[in-house]
């Protein structure tokens, strides 16, 4: 893990920190867009002096995600479930923390995926590195009704700095990965349609803590919104953990607040109730 120590000395004081997951939290997958009321809430939070953090399992700089990053324009970014943390992600891109998966683990995962016909890999810039390419295409067609992948041999991934991988498939494959790779966190997506794969020891909560330290924001002034398993540690870390109304049951049961679903303006209304916008 690399940590950058050259941090900006004159950071603007913020009232508090508000963190948002992307998929099924800000982003409505039924419409393929961030809900307008959530974007308005983010805008008002910034105007009211709060630090807005996007905390996602995605690599927000790949071609499938970068437009969402630009739309949200957060003050800070926790991406790939805390394996990379940045301030000013659309400007200076100051890196606070960056974990790179070991080549040995990456090689074993690729081999396991090929031997067991499990689709896993990642997208970097305009290239897609995956085992079982046909499964990935079908996965795309099932969930976004299109696929424009630019596949390159998955072995080329060993030449890249990789922080996390994506598994495309059902519960059985996720369980096989969890059983055979105890050093991995396997975070299922909220609809059991795949999972994030990353080395244990990293989480969105760890990333938020780093950001809060830089901005000198106490945990008492933090709020986090999420919908799935990879948001659980973030919810526990924040003073107020909010589950959106369309979250999985487990997250809603544990949350401090359960908002309305995102398509019913849940994020906006909750922040208004909290007196933050």
Model-derived regions: residue spans:
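Non-catalytic pre-domain segments flanking phosphatase-related domains
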Residues: 1-20, 217
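Asp-based phosphoryl-transfer active-site loop
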Residues: 14-31, 235
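Active-site metal-binding loops of divalent metal-dependent hydrolases
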Residues: 22, 58, 227-228
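Active-site phosphate-binding/coordination module
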Residues: 36-136
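Hydrophobic/aromatic beta-strand patches that form the interior of the parallel beta-sheet core
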Residues: 53, 78, 223-225, 242, ...
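Short, structured coil segments at secondary-structure junctions
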Residues: 72-73, 81, 180-184, 237-238, ...
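Conserved acidic, metal-coordinating active-site core of Asp-based
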Residues: 112-233, 237, 246
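Asp-based, Mg2+/Mn2+-dependent phosphohydrolase catalytic module
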Residues: 237, 242-277
């Amino acid at each position: 893990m690399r940590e950058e120590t050259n941090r900006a000395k004159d950071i603007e004081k913020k009232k508090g920190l508000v963190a948002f997951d992307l998929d099924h939290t800000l982003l409505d997958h039924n419409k393929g867009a961030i809900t307008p009321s959530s974007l308005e809430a983010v805008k008002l939070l910034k105007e009211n002096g709060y630090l807005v953090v996007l905390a996602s399992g995605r690599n927000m700089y790949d071609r499938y995600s970068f437009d969402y990053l630009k739309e949200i324009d957060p003050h800070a970014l926790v991406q790939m479930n805390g394996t990379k943390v940045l301030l000013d992600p659309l400007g200076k891109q100051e890196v606070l923390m960056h974990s790179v998966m070991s080549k040995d683990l990456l090689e074993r995962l690729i081999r396991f995926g090929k031997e067991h016909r499990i689709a896993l890999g990642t997208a970097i810039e305009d290239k897609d590195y995956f085992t079982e390419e046909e499964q990935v295409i079908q996965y795309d067609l099932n969930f976004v009704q299109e696929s424009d992948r630019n596949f390159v041999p998955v072995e080329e991934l060993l030449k890249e700095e990789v922080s996390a991988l994506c598994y495309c498939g059902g519960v059985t494959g996720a369980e096989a990965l969890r059983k055979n790779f105890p050093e991995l966190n396997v975070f299922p997506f909220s609809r059991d349609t795949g999972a994030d794969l990353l080395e244990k020891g990293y989480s969105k909560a760890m990333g938020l803590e780093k950001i809060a330290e830089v901005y000198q924001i106490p945990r008492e002034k933090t709020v986090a919104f999420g919908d799935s398993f990879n948001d659980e540690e973030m919810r526990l870390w924040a003073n107020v953990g909010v589950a959106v109304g369309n979250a999985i049951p487990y997250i809603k049961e544990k949350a401090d607040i359960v908002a309305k679903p995102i398509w019913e303006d849940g994020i906006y209304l909750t922040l208004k109730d909290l007196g933050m916008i």
